[in-house]
């Protein structure tokens, strides 16, 4: 087993096939060999009767015996009439069974496939095949042929099969022609192929360096790529310069391409302050809608609650609390406003205020909906309020449009949420497009309370929604600033606020819940992190390793998450005979590993514990590998209350999560955090990263590394600018 070989033969039968991702198990009758071979791998649209040359590796399945795991497959059409009849009768064409297949081959022989594709009217000469049915068969066969052509084209450039299926869904029969006309379409958002790869494909096909397709693709790539940098738009001059630099051409040529895109593709150009901003159409629509809807909510009067102060006093008595002035103001403002922004750092009483607002709304007879951007944040929101909370995506009924490559939601203006009031926590994580989707799903009379910490890192997606709302001065807002006495006893909270004010955290050896261990060499630092997670914290604090999260500002370097994960996996989940594993590049996935999804994937299927089935695993979701099938082609991963199955071609989207970057930890809290303190890229050595990292720890934080880096980070309040027009549009809307 483990040997690589190449076999050639004819598909005898297809045992299993997943139409979503192409994963297939088939029996191959090998030329010159009596016993068939079981082949497993990504072989979409496989059918009995077709010929294949398969190159792969032998593995031993404990139940089914030897299997050839396909690495590459060359396919050919049936070579005789018997194979042709088997191929057509295999179910590859809906409605064509063995009997119809025999009749077709008997009539048209080896010319059958050409007749189906090019002369479908001749099929009507067979009894039972109408003109309509003949055209349906022809269309289905052309789609199948087209998919295979696209697969073969993309395979030459080592691009995955699921990409071929996505292109085929968009362009249908014209998919292959669309790729010939403009291979740069692969770099569009719904396909996500890196521009450099697409550019290499196009240039190898003979496209010129100044081809209009190339110029326009570079502009669109820069606009979509910079969404990941948080920009809603790009200034015209910066966009032109970036696109020209990307492909090495003069800016004049790119400027002409941009003008064409504005004319016919819908790229939007609008003045923002003193620059001309260029938007992708949907981002412009999102920005204008969010501004208009929020301004409308601010201006629209809401039903007032009689005797607000008396109600608040009753809530205080019932909950056994006494609100500070700002907390009382927040609860009262929630009663009188259609929209409210509640902000504050750790220990300032956001949770107490939030409970009060929820109770107030319930006493007003309002149906309250609690939401958060991530599953972990929603779970925590539910715990602190004692009510059910859910993710924004789940509440809105998120789905994915394969044709446009965009997320869609079932709930919108036509089918709004039933709630009278919606409360959203962790608003710093909400990007512009998610904000638009939420606002579209609210009834005109629905109240909205947004809660967050503006000093946390901004959303991964485009926009700086919380910051723009706060600094616009348009949205009624209460900023909680008082750190309460009980919270002041926590060194975690004291140090978080010190960092937020530009002061270095205190690095005393023992502060109860905040410890510092000085380790100047990378080797000793990594060794100490491993010891803390494997031995010291579990023994001294009674914590399981799963309750401890290692954070680092960076992925790269000796103290980055890649290096840390390698060491932590070896220490916490070493290989064992009874523990299945899968090699993927330079990574090994093993049963029991803590892993993280690194990009949004709307196609991964999952099943909840209650039997609910859905799809979509998102960037930052963390789970544990529960099972790896013996062939190494399927990984079962547990995400909180959901179980998802990954095929091998999706493993590139997974990473180890024993250690993660601070950015990936947004919206989460952990019982214990081990935070790496070591130099990294200048853009990461900033106050917001350190503040966010410290505030991830609930009970314990151990800072490991040099003693100079935390102070330097606290003193550096530089923030990467995000191009957004939301703040200005809000102000203009209220003018």
Q: Model-derived features: where do they sit?
A:
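Accessory, non-ATPase domains that flank or precede helicase/AAA+ motor cores in DNA-metabolism machines
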Residues: 1-310, 316
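A generic structural signal for residues embedded in beta-strands
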Residues: 14, 54, 597, 625-628, ...
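Short, well-ordered loop/turn sites that connect or cap secondary structure elements
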Residues: 46-48, 416, 589, 617
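Loop/turn positions that initiate beta-strands
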Residues: 49-51, 592, 620
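ASCE P-loop NTPase helicase motor core
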Residues: 233, 328-331, 336-510
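Conserved pre-motif I regulatory segment
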Residues: 311-338
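Conserved helicase motor core of P-loop NTPases
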Residues: 454-615, 626
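C-terminal accessory regions
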Residues: 501, 609, 619-735
